[in-house]
């Protein structure tokens, strides 16, 4: 057994004792009832299970939860898809996903949404040139698998959020 303490979507959890072999995906879904994080491939290849990990230095990245033990997240601060909206108010990225019909079955949506959010946060700190935007989005979403082939729609949704707030996310033209 492992004693686990962590923060999820701004709320502290723990100490809670979990089996050493319990995956983070199972912890979220079975222990906490947070079913937005999906179990896709079970090999960290499709990234439908990706959550956001917030480091103390202010950087964030996504991490798969299907192969990672819950214990490996001890002491960490993470965000799941359930943590994006504030009450009934969706984020700009969530609204863009809906407007673009970026999901069909929705299985991969949480991973794409989390990756898109990390990209937005990164660009807010280090904007890119407009000419580099398409490649920047493609690189960020690379590795996420959509069984329904919604890649273009996810890409377009992320791009629209960035362009709608270009002063925040894009470098000033030289």
PLM regions and their residue ranges:
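Signature of N-terminal electron-transfer/Fe-S-associated modules in redox systems
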Residues: 1-174
């Amino acid at each position: 057994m492992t004693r686990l303490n962590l923060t999820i979507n701004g709320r502290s959890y723990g100490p809670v004792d979990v089996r050493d072999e319990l995956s983070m995906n199972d912890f979220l879904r079975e222990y906490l009832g947070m079913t937005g994080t999906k179990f896709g491939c079970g090999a960290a290849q499709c990234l439908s299970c990706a959550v956001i990990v917030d480091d103390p230095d202010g950087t964030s990245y996504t991490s798969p939860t299907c192969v990672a033990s819950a214990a490996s997240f001890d002491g960490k601060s993470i965000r799941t898809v359930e943590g994006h909206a504030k009450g009934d108010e969706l984020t700009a990225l969530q609204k863009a996903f809906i407007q673009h019909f970026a999901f069909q079955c929705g299985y991969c949506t949480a991973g794409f949404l989390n990756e898109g959010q990390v990209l937005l946060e990164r660009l807010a700190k280090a904007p890119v040139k407009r000419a580099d935007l398409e490649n920047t989005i493609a690189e960020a979403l690379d590795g996420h698998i959509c069984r329904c082939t919604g890649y273009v729609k996810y890409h377009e949704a992320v791009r629209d959020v960035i362009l709608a707030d270009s002063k925040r996310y894009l470098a000033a033209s030289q």
